[in-house]
UniProtKB/Swiss-Prot annotation:
Naturally occurring in which organism (per UniProt): Paraburkholderia phytofirmans (strain DSM 17436 / LMG 22146 / PsJN) (Burkholderia phytofirmans)
Main function: Catalyzes the reversible reaction in which hydroxymethyl group from 5,10-methylenetetrahydrofolate is transferred onto alpha-ketoisovalerate to form ketopantoate.
PANTHER family (UniProt xref): 3-METHYL-2-OXOBUTANOATE HYDROXYMETHYLTRANSFERASE (PTHR20881:SF0)
Domain of life, source organism: Bacteria
Family of this protein: Belongs to the PanB family.
SUPFAM superfamilies tied to this protein: Phosphoenolpyruvate/pyruvate domain
Pathway it works in: Cofactor biosynthesis; (R)-pantothenate biosynthesis; (R)-pantoate from 3-methyl-2-oxobutanoate: step 1/2
Transmembrane segments: none
Protein's recorded name: 3-methyl-2-oxobutanoate hydroxymethyltransferase
Amino acid sequence: MTYLQEASRNAITVPKLQAMRDAGEKIAMLTCYDASFAALLDRAGVDVLLIGDSLGNVLQGQTTTLPVSLADIAYHTASVARARPAALIVADLPFGTYGTPEDAFRSSVELMRAGAQMVKLEGGEWLADTVRFLVERSIPVCAHVGLTPQSVHAFGGFKVQGKTEAGATQLMRDSLAVQQAGAQLIVMEAIPTLLASDVTKQLRIPTIGIGAGLDCSGQVLVLHDMLGIFPGKRPRFVKDFMHGQPSILAAVEAYVAAVKDGSFPGPEHTF
């Protein structure tokens, strides 16, 4: 089966992402939930595959990511890992699985055993001790700041973050704190472009934007969104790369090319 073939390019590792950032090469990231798509995305040149808790929305039909369990993420991580992609495999820690450093470690071990090479946690300054605890135990960490979907009820909906002076200051503090704690990657979601640019300049680690402007070290989208598979209104930061393309592979290749050459996101995709 094609999804069990060995990857034909050099592996993307955590140090490789840092080298890409330092060299000014943009990082293309997409969500992925199964072996077949893992093989296709890898063939298209995607650098990072994220087993996101967004699977709750796009696979399970949930209205939020909160119902997604650790077992759900582990199952889909194992499915992606079986494709043996060259792309780095990052797995989300779901809501309620990292309340303490010890909880986060136990949850991360399960995902790493399933095939993850890095785990992603939502939170900033308050999460620094947990990030440090994981990194000290050889678990690479991606932090997620800005609009963190697991906090949807605390935010009162899916709203742009960092728009006020206080909010921007806190987001900068959050980003610096998780970097200082040892995070090797950070996702910034739905924040003003200028703020994302400032944070990217202040940090030494790669920043991955989703609705955070062009100046981030890379971009991420939910796979279904960039293929035009979204019920209802299209999110502002999403572009339908499937439109006008002859195949899914061509659409993903177009996404990778647009991220790499800086043509995505455009002003219409940012805040």
